[in-house]
Amino acid sequence: MEYKVTPPAVLREPLVTPNKLLMGPGPSNAPQRVLDAMSRPILGHLHPETLKIMDDIKEGVRYLFQTNNIATFCLSASGHGGMEATLCNLLEDGDVILIGHTGHWGDRSADMATRYGADVRVVKSKVGQSLSLDEIRDALLIHKPSVLFLTQGDSSTGVLQGLEGVGALCHQHNCLLIVDTVASLGGAPMFMDRWEIDAMYTGSQKVLGAPPGITPVSFSHRAVERYKRRNTKVKVYYWDMSLVGDYWGCFGRPRIYHHTISSTLLYGLREAIAMACEEGLPALIARHEDCAKRLYRGLQDAGFELYADPKDRLSTVTTIKVPQGVDWLKAAQYAMKTYLVEISGGLGPTAGQVFRIGLMGQNATTERVDRVLQVFQEAVAAVKPDVQVKGKM
């Protein structure tokens, strides 16, 4: 029988992967130690060596999250998978969920929750600000939700949401708290148990500096008990916490096959977490906060205006208002074409309004802050020469 579709000519060409400096909102550049780990031989998804690596990762995630939750594991997915899984496991048809909206990820979580049959309510913060505890309390009283969803660090707006006291407040109202820490973990304090957070997830490709595609997640005892009281099965097999948790050895039952996990991604994530543990959370967070302050000073000294309120700024993603008359896309293209430096535009509610500069993982250094400041100022001046940039680094 004749094969009429021929091998594509493009696959006879060599693979090209330029070495770019990723100073956008993620992914960040992976350390060489992570890349080296990922070149190791592939293992089977139930080989004892693979299960040992998974156990190592679980312990590391508990440290990063500051939790002792037994239901701590990883999903074979991007950070969106964490959002899907936390919502999918804790919501049933008709359940009221309150979304704390500080940017695009409030919109995305509301969309997902609607698809799972939830009754979605939204409380919006002021532009560029986080929600206060009083605003959250008032919304809980009005809407009486069974779940509150918050994004600790919204990468679209550069806003850091305060969390201390929110979990206790939720539990006074018989409400569970879900928190997205994809863009914030390692760049801001996080105490999952102390702050009484019930479900939380992060991304592998931000501060941790591993490739995207594997997402740490954790569920509290309260969340597990809520899951056990469900009247219906979790709507998506792939996200079911009991099934994935059994694969990860969380509940004391025999480990079962759930899906074929990427051993390569496990290697990279393990080493990325090991590096974070070696540095330690206090030093890791301080490094990101110090670099962010250096970036803020440099931008403001050059005459740029920051988008987020000073008291609510996220250290890992800085949002800069696009100066009048500047085409943000042309400026970003200039930075990439001239220097192979990634600078991003806005997302969702900030699309066309801001630039976004990310300082994450090994890109959170004084040298890279100074580099991105230099490139950013030159790029803006190049596409709009009459914009006054006060000085160059």
Curated annotation (Swiss-Prot):
Protein residues bound to pyridoxal 5'-phosphate: 78-80, 205, 257, 260
UniProt xrefs under SUPFAM superfamilies: PLP-dependent transferases (SSF53383)
Binding site for glyoxylate: 155, 356
Organism annotation: Aedes aegypti (Yellowfever mosquito)
Superkingdom classification of source: Eukaryota
Higher taxonomy: Eukaryota, Metazoa, Ecdysozoa, Arthropoda, Hexapoda
GO biological process, any: glyoxylate catabolic process
Expression tissues: Expressed in head and abdomen of adult females.
A Pfam family recorded for this sequence: Aminotran_5
Name of this protein: Alanine--glyoxylate aminotransferase
GO cellular component: peroxisome
Cofactors: pyridoxal 5'-phosphate
Subunit structure: Homodimer.
GO molecular function: alanine-glyoxylate transaminase activity; L-serine-pyruvate transaminase activity; pyridoxal phosphate binding
Entry-linked InterPro entries: Aminotrans_V_dom (IPR000192), Aminotrans_V_PyrdxlP_BS (IPR020578), PyrdxlP-dep_Trfase (IPR015424), PyrdxlP-dep_Trfase_major (IPR015421), PyrdxlP-dep_Trfase_small (IPR015422), SP_NH2Trfase/AEP_transaminase (IPR024169)
Keyword Transferase: yes
E.C. number(s) listed in UniProt: 2.6.1.44
